[in-house]
């Protein structure tokens, strides 16, 4: 859910999937954060969701060793508060964290509940945002020791290493 939501923009190619409230509604429904019959979203909802998406990307950068922006963390705190969470128990008795809010606050709250649950489960550190400044693509690190840094070593990893090599060569 988190990966699909954050990857609704291709930073490198400048392709934005969420350009209007209807597209936001469709995307949040597709990732399971918004119920199918939820009311239409507004331009303000779109602005809030885009800000949260980038705050999540900043949080995911921490999983590759970068420090998240304090403003991004503050926004995520505000969204978490707006979600007003409750513990819900499924038919099998397993607990889940669910927002009491509806609309965009509820949808963004569901996404944050997934973040929280994956942190508690110990799987959050495997979801990462590519640290290459023009990329930021979110990927799941499937390496044995969770050491992947780039969304693609053959693309972003090589480009970054080549850029560093050239800078060192010029400095010599």
Cite the ranges covered by each PLM segment.
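Short helix-coil boundary/hinge micro-motifs
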Residues: 1-129, 136
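BZIP DNA-binding basic region
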Residues: 110-164, 170-172
């Amino acid at each position: 859910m988190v990966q699909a939501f954050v990857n609704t923009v291709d930073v490198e190619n400048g392709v934005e999937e969420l350009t209007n409230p209807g597209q936001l509604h469709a995307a949040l429904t597709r990732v399971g954060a918004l119920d199918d019959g939820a009311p239409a979203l507004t331009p303000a909802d779109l602005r809030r969701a885009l800000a949260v998406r980038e705050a999540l990307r900043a949080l995911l950068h921490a999983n590759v060793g970068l420090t998240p922006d304090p403003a991004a963390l503050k926004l995520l705190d505000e969204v978490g508060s707006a979600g007003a969470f409750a513990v819900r128990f499924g038919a099998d008795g397993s607990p889940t964290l669910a927002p009491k809010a509806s609309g965009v606050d509820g949808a963004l709250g569901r996404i944050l509940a997934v973040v929280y649950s994956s942190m508690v489960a110990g799987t959050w550190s495997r979801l990462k945002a590519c640290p290459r400044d023009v990329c930021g693509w979110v990927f799941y690190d499937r390496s044995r020791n969770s050491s992947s840094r780039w969304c693609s070593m053959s693309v972003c990893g090589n480009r970054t290493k080549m850029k560093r090599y050239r800078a060192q060569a010029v400095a010599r």
